[in-house]
């Protein structure tokens, strides 16, 4: 992979933006354009750029007023655009696993839930049923624990949608249905799987 200096990277520092959402929305659009241009000739490099942007989004946007919904919409559109770029990159399973580890860390660090939609794409991001099954096995014990009748609290885990998406992509449909039946609260986001 050739060395590449992403123009957007310096613009997405932690707390880089004030409270107004106009500038971050514009910067997200510019970053997407930059990544898509690179994707035409170097899909693996573009996928790496997509991961870098996803890692940087939430920390950079934490201080922005997102009450209008424009910022959330821009981030969701970015995820919708970036996921296929990451999926299409033809890489070794070990590199894809490292990418997923980085994305999982970004999801865990997502304090303002800007990139939570990424979990819905987890099965696609895994690309292979084997990798999806591996991630399902990672997430499954935690989901079962938070959905247990004995669990205290409200039963939230940032990896729930990623677990369900991984089970689906791995072809473990019966296991997915059994798990969904264990949910303490019946939410459409979980039951659609």
Predicted regions and their residues:
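Eukaryote-biased, non-catalytic alpha-solenoid scaffold regions
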Residues: 1-193
């Amino acid at each position: 992979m050739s060395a590449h200096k992403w123009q957007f990277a310096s613009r997405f520092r932690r707390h880089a933006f004030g409270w107004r959402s106009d500038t971050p929305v514009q910067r997200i659009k510019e970053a997407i354009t930059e990544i898509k241009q690179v994707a035409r000739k170097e899909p693996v490099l573009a996928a790496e750029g997509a991961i870098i942007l996803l890692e940087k989004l939430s920390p950079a946007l934490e201080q922005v007023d997102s009450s209008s919904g424009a910022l959330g919409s821009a981030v969701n559109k970015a995820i919708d655009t970036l996921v296929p770029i990451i999926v299409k990159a033809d890489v070794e399973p070990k590199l894809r696993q490292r990418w997923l580890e980085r994305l999982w860390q970004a999801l865990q660090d997502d304090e303002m839930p800007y990139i939570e939609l990424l979990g819905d794409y987890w099965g696609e991001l895994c690309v292979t049923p084997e990798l999806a099954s591996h991630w399902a096995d990672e997430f499954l014990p935690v989901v079962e624990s938070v959905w247990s009748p004995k669990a205290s609290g409200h039963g939230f885990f940032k990896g729930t949608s990623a677990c369900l998406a991984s089970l689906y992509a791995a072809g473990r449909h019966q296991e997915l249905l059994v798990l969904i039946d264990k949910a303490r609260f019946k939410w459409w986001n979980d039951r659609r799987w």
